[in-house]
Amino acid sequence: MAHKKSGGSSSNGRDSESKRLGVKKFGGEKVLAGNILVRQRGTKFYPGSGVGIGKDHTLFALVQGAVGFVTKKHNRTYVTVTPAAQPAE
């Protein structure tokens, strides 16, 4: 039995693939219904009006309009989509 470990191998040197989380559409940006607004783990951001939430806590637009971020009670940040004004016909 060798009393010294052979050189040339490392027990470290691995990392997991990044998950590309974060805010995808920022305040004031125009979005279409179905656009992903935030990818997150848990509810760092909460859905406000015009925004839905997926089973993995992804926030997405339910309507076409402009994105907004609002901080309300309990220091919760809500993401909203304000519908674009419909042109008069």
From Swiss-Prot:
- Keyword set includes Protease: no
Instruction: State the similarity comment.
Output: Belongs to the bacterial ribosomal protein bL27 family.
This one is known as Large ribosomal subunit protein bL27
Keyword list, A-Z:
Ribonucleoprotein, Ribosomal protein
Q: Which PANTHER family match?
A: LARGE RIBOSOMAL SUBUNIT PROTEIN BL27M, RIBOSOMAL PROTEIN L27
Write out the GO biological process terms: translation
- Which InterPro entries does this UniProt record tie to the protein? Ribosomal_bL27, Ribosomal_bL27_CS
What HAMAP family would the database entry show? Ribosomal_bL27
Q: Which GO terms describe its molecular function?
A: structural constituent of ribosome
Task: Please give the residue ranges the record annotates as the region Disordered.
Answer: 1-21
* Domain of life of the organism encoding this protein: Bacteria
GO cellular component terms, alphabetically, are: cytosolic large ribosomal subunit
